[in-house]
């Protein structure tokens, strides 16, 4: 059973609004930002937007990023991908990694800009080189699929590993898949199971199902139907249909 290869499992709409890190020079700015954050967390989006807009217009990168998220989601303002891109770009040009990642996503999906895989790779790379795990994972996928860059399994694995070592469950699962298939690395089922387990323990449904198959078939681990059933059950609980199917089979005493 292979992972479903969706490009952006950790895409824009999962982006969070980031809180202000206190600095000595801006007590008033800090208070205003925190007021906006409190309003946002209480779903009072219009108030948050009104507080953050003047800050963003003054060049405050985190406020610019937050406005981009609000425009992308239509929170406190009419949904507008063009405005989202505008604010993500302003924050990205100041070096804000999360904004670079989201800008890459917008180019990848053609939201608010003309679809352009090369530009998507450009912005993912900028964020990835700053150590942003989601961008590292997405850059790995772009290399694996040859989108916006020459296909290169070795580069894909390099970026998966960087993200996986930071705890990104998607990257851990994809790294496990690379070891299973011998793509960009020497085939190694034991190493594959190691990474599938890390992702599975974080609730990654596909990884849980694959770990179930590993125990069922003895790939990288000893055959253990009890553990196979356990992981299939977890995968099923998280919506994986393959996990549900094989959990049912093991319950009925089938293979």
Regions found by a protein language model. Give the residues of each.
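Terminal, low-structured helical/coil segments at or just beyond the last alpha-helical repeat
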Residues: 3-6, 29, 222-223, 227-255
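Short helix-capping/linker turns of helical repeat alpha-solenoids
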Residues: 27, 32, 39-44, 57-60, ...
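Sec-dependent N-terminal signal peptides
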Residues: 5-14
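Hydrophobic face of amphipathic alpha-helices that form TPR/SEL1-like repeat modules
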Residues: 31-39, 51-55, 66-73, 102-109, ...
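C-terminal segment of classical bacterial N-terminal signal peptides
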Residues: 15-23
